[in-house]
Amino acid sequence: MTIHDKEKDKEKKDKKEGTLRLLTSGEIALAKSVFRSTIPYHKVWIHFDSYLPFGLQDQYTAMAPNGEIYFREHYREDYSHTVPFYQHMFIHEMAHVWQREKGLNVIGRSLVSWAVSYHYVLDSRYLSEYPMEQQAQIIADHFILNAEGYTKWCDLRDQDVITLDGNISEPIIRQLYQNTLRGFPW
């Protein structure tokens, strides 16, 4: 954790749950690097709160069931100025916002997302042929590979943040991601 992230942690601790904000300009730029102009960024709210009533959302779980993102313990003031772990989480949740924009029933599918595997194997399928959570993981994992490089990608895979299974040699995974993400974002 960098000094910058320690300052952000202090900043977060000074905030109270129940607050919300729009995306920062840095977060919009970060998300546009992945989703281009396929999301109405000016409508996306970031909540420092539980989506579920009575605070039932787990402290360490982020959710984006309604086109808005709900963080609790992992809330940050600006995900564009955080470590790769938090940027991965942010892009994963933005993938759910994108899925909702494309007509996927994110609320219905999110009710069982706690029970599904985030692990995936890249094969000849298109992104659209993977389940909802695996789609979000593929998008976020690929983002880290491109933004941070193969070494950081491997570090996060060792921490089970990156969830690709199978052969992970760099040239192979780059080609597999390219094949899976062909046409993305549509």
Provide a role label for each language-model segment.
Residues 1, 51-60, 64-66, 102-123:
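Alpha-helical membrane-targeting segments
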Residues 1-17:
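Short, contiguous pre-domain boundary segments
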Residues 12-15, 23-33, 39, 104-186:
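Metalloprotease/metallohydrolase-associated module, dominated by Zn2+-dependent proteases
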Residues 15-66:
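Auxiliary, metal-adjacent structural segments of Zn-dependent hydrolase domains
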Residues 37, 56-62, 69-91, 126-128:
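Short pre-active-site segment immediately N-terminal to the catalytic Zn-binding motif
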Residues 49-53, 69, 75-77, 95, ...:
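Short, solvent-exposed loop/turn segments at secondary-structure junctions
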Residues 88-100:
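Active-site recognition of the HExxH zinc-binding catalytic motif
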